[in-house]
Amino acid sequence: MEGRIIMSEYKFETKQLHVGQENPDPATDARAVPIYATTSYVFKNSAHAAARFGLADAGNIYGRLTNSTQDVFEKRIASLEGGVAALALASGAAAITYTLQSLAQNGGHIVAQKTIYGGSYNLLAHTLPNFGITSTFVNIHDLNEVKTAIQDNTRAIYMETLGNPNSDIPDIDALAELAHKHGLPLVVDNTFGTPYLIRPIEHGADIVVHSATKFIGGHGTTLGGVIVDSGKFDWEASGNYPAISSPNPSYHGVSFTKAVGPAAFVTYVRAILLRDTGATISPFAAFLLLQGVETLSLRLERHAENTKKVVEFLKNHPQVEKVNHPSLPEHPDNTLYQKYFPNGGGSIFTFEIKGGQEEAHKFIDNLKIFSLLANVADAKSLVIHPATTTHSQLTEEELADQGIKPNTIRLSIGTEHIDDIIADLQNGFKVIKEG
């Protein structure tokens, strides 16, 4: 049973179970990944400690930076996404914030898709400007508009594989080509896509971020985020990313590009931002997220299967005004959906109920199986009214610009039996019809 296992030779479904722990735990022979509940690590001697702190020797230094349970999770996600390295963090918000802060620090600018998660929109529109980072929100489908928005101080283009909440789909290949033509990295939030359905790095993305709280964890139990470094972007070429390529004074002049090569970006985020600001994921959270990863493909198949049937049900329902799902032929992104999501997807989407906010709230309040909460991508079916919750910080103009109306309802389709899901939705419509 001994011998080196080369995981790159295996399929996704096998990698999601084994990468990072190809053999049993060497200390205990445990087959499951142990929870390493420790704050710090013993060095062999003073020279060993100095080598670790100087980044000359890879390994554990302190629990704020690394943990062996976390390490397995990072290796597994990096492998599934096709990246060279990953960094797990305490939340998806931390992953996005650290990524954009690292790229656009000291007066940088971000070109961002305007139809994104409300929390990310607020980060870009209101919080990062307080740190000297500005953003321009664009119609990500209009490459001319994206190109025009690029400035001399632009440091990244930011997008989501499936927009929140309406599941619109940007053309990753085209955006990657545009970004690279201008010497910029393309940052892709693949939370809703997941590496099982789409791997943005294969389409030219340079950095992939996730809220692991969603599909990766899959059970609504654990907060977590992850940054995946493709290892393909040349940080030295443009001279616009000195924090990553130039000697760093807090590491005695270490250049991350020279010290670690392709993994320079994610190493910089770990060694500097995580070290100094501490959005550390706990070993227990990393363990729970690993449990989710092990069934990712199975759950996504069921999510996609159920979603297809719910979309069909809603499309033909007399009390539904419109269904916003890219699988529908009339959806403007249907061609891109066929290209990027051949195995289905988009289990988080919206529909517009006939009526207004009152009807939307009444429908939601009378569902039994669907839970009214702010999370998505749970094994359980979820529902929310975006205009008064997740996107409530937006102005009326911003809501309209993102296609969020008073009668818009967001669904996150779970893995329950499809008959029960549809019966629950039908009951919500019935209550409205009966007044």
Role assignments for model-derived ranges:
Residues E2, S8-N67, K75-R76:
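N-terminal "arm"/small-domain region of PLP-dependent enzymes with the aminotransferase-like
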Residues R4-I6, V84, A125, T134, ...:
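PLP-dependent enzyme catalytic core of the Aspartate aminotransferase-like
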Residues S8, Q16, G20, P24, ...:
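Conserved PLP-enzyme active-site core in the AAT-like
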Residues P24, V42-S46, D234-W235, L296, ...:
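Short, acidic Gly/Pro/Ser/Thr-rich loop/turn segments
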Residues N45-T97, G119-H126:
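Conserved N-terminal alpha-helix of the aminotransferase class I/II PLP-enzyme fold
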Residues A58, V84, A285, L289, ...:
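Short amphipathic alpha-helical segments
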Residues L162, T191-G193, L328, K354, ...:
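Active-site beta-loop-alpha junctions enriched in small/polar residues
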